[in-house]
Structure formats: structure tokens, C-alpha cells
Amino acid sequence: MSFIDPRTYIPSNSTESQILKFTFIVCVPICVILIVLLVLYIMRRNSNTNVDWSSLGGFVPTNNNLSTAELGLSKDIREMLPIVIYKESFTVNDTQCSVCLGDYQAEEKLQQMPSCGHTFHMECIDLWLTSHTTCPLCRLSLIPKPSVDLSHQSIEIVSSIENTNGGEASTQPDSQSATEAIIHIDDVEEGNRDSIEVVKESEENDRNSVGTSDGCCSCRLGEKA
């Protein structure tokens, strides 16, 4: 029979309590750190999503603004589009609505695009133009282009006319100088011809004078002999 020394005996309850204390000491700081990191992550995510649109110079997009905003033509402009009544003998290029792909029926009211002449169902084109400003078939814009500044155009035309007049004035002396140069060249050529003729005449005169001088010398020699 064995006896346990009471001095070295450690009850089991004390070991379990020590294990629990150790686990608590280790796990609690880890949990606190995880909670703090989670809170910081949530705060940072919220700060990124809640952008101050007013500081960026824009507006805060809300569901009401997006639902009521019209990206296309206004209702007043849509109501001003010409309305035509479709007939079988009516000369239209389209016999089918390009929006709903439905055929036109006799005596049916259609709306016509003033820029291209294409026709559509009134309900279809009205729904289309609430979010678009172009014809659904040819994509031609229904918004008129801004008028051209006529004063700016007139200034450009006047400046171009002045430039052309200046160019003509500058070309006239050039043409005149060219004609003068041609005349001068012709005069020089005529002068050269005259000088050549004068040289020829002088050479003939020299030859004649030499011949006469030779004849005189021969006559004088004959007299002396």
C-alpha cells in the first residue's frame, strides 16, 4: 500500500484553475486586438464610402434625383414633334417602328423626327426621347447646332479679302518686273546684235583700209623702182 506525501501532492482542481488562468491571459488580449482591428476596418470603409460630394463641386446623388432626372429631351420639346397619320397610300420610308418593331396600322398617329423624317409610335418615341436626344434609327441628333457667329465670319472674310488683295498687289510688281526683265534682256540681245554688226563692219573697214594701204605701198614701191 502506497502513501502520498502531503507536501508534494497537488490537487487536480488547482491545475485546472491554472490552465484556465493561462488561457484567459493569452486569449483576452488576442480578442481585444481583433476587435480593435475590426472596428478600425469598419470606420475606414465607412469613411471611404461617405464621400463629401459638395467639396468635390458636385451634387449628392440620391434615388430621387436619379429617378426624376431626364437625360434626353424635355417633355415640352417632345410634345412639339410633328404628328402624322399613317395611311396605306402615305409615302413614308418606314412601315415599321424601329423601337418596338411593330407594323404601322392605318389611321395610326405617328411622330416624325424633323431632322431625318423617320416616324415612330408616339408612345415608343416618347419613352426613347426621355433618355436620348438622337433618332433611334439613324442616330441623328435632334438638338440643333449652335448658330455660327456671323460677325466673326465677316471679319474672317474681310481679312481673307484683304490678304488676297495684298497678294494681287504684291504679284503685280513681280509680273511688271518680270516683263521689264524680259524687255531688258531683249534690249540686251538686240544691243549685242547691233554691237556684233558694228564689229563686223569695223572689221570689214579695217580689211579695206589694210588693202588700200597695201595697194598704196605697192604703188609707191613701183614708182621708186
Curated annotation (Swiss-Prot):
Pathway: Protein modification; protein ubiquitination. SUPFAM superfamilies: RING/U-box (SSF57850). Keywords: Membrane, Metal-binding, Transferase, Transmembrane, Transmembrane helix, Ubl conjugation pathway, Zinc, Zinc-finger. One of its GO terms (biological process) is protein ubiquitination. It is a single-pass membrane protein. Coiled coil: none annotated. Its main location: membrane. It is an enzyme of class 2 (transferase). The chain crosses the membrane at residues 22-42. It is found in: Membrane. The keyword S-adenosyl-L-methionine does not apply. One of its GO terms (cellular component) is membrane. One of its GO terms (molecular function) is ubiquitin-protein transferase activity. It holds the Pfam family zf-RING_2. A zinc finger (RING-type) spans 97-139. InterPro entries: RING-type_E3_ubiquitin-ligase, Znf_RING, Znf_RING/FYVE/PHD. Gene3D superfamilies: Zinc/RING finger domain, C3HC4 (zinc finger). CDD domains: RING-H2_EL5-like. Its EC number is 2.3.2.27. It catalyses: S-ubiquitinyl-[E2 ubiquitin-conjugating enzyme]-L-cysteine + [acceptor protein]-L-lysine = [E2 ubiquitin-conjugating enzyme]-L-cysteine + N(6)-ubiquitinyl-[acceptor protein]-L-lysine. Belongs to the RING-type zinc finger family. ATL subfamily. E3 ubiquitin-protein ligase able to catalyze polyubiquitination with ubiquitin-conjugating enzyme E2 UBC8, UBC10, UBC11, and UBC34 in vitro. The RING-type zinc finger domain mediates binding to an E2 ubiquitin-conjugating enzyme. This is E3 ubiquitin-protein ligase ATL59. It comes from Arabidopsis thaliana.
